Amino acid sequence: MTDVSDFIDVSDPAALEDAVARAREVLADRGCVVLPTDTVYGIGADAFSPLAVAVLLAAKGRSRTMPPPVLIADRRVMAGLAYDVPEEAEALAERFWPGALTLILKSQPTLTWDLGETRGTVALRVPDDAVARELLYAVGPMAVSSANRTGMDAATTADDARSMLGESVALYLDAGPRESRDPSTIVDCTVTPFRVARQGSVPLDELRAVVPDLLAEGEEPPVAAERIAAADDAAAARPADREA
């Protein structure tokens, strides 16, 4: 990996093939690539290289307690990276992928990767961006986080990303400005009922059209009616307190 970052304009489709080839070289060398997505620009690395993931986290100034999501080229890849996927999670993927929805699932225990302190989970997404998906088809799953230093605004241009990340990234793919700083919506599918871990681009009402009992970000599950009734019955059965 060189000490000087490459910057390639991929807004011209004719440049994409060479850009993807260069990205493959960088990723094989355990380096990081800034790439466009359908939300904001992301910083990506080989998901199966612990060293590359460590480089990504260091570039962002982030610890292992905040592991990056994994972007995949299409929904079929999910079966190889996650297991015991609930039917409702499959339904969310079918409805919103490719798109701005990230699903937290149980990670396949046989995978030899180290994304950080994931507690046996993996956050997966299929981006709705032609450049990102072309790259993912070529190189496989990538650990990808927003292309910014932790605590700073997400980058909506490749230049924004370069101003924050500099030469900690070996290659910048410039596909023009993104329209919004809104991140993807994250849904935790490892809990019952499912819970929105981060509200983003996909609205809650659209998610609930697929999973009606989905909990909003910060919302607590309702107490079941039978539990309330049982508590009332128990209270009624207790003898009345006597006056002293």
For each feature predicted by the language model, list its residue ranges:
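Active-site-adjacent structural elements in enzyme catalytic cores
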Residues: 1-244
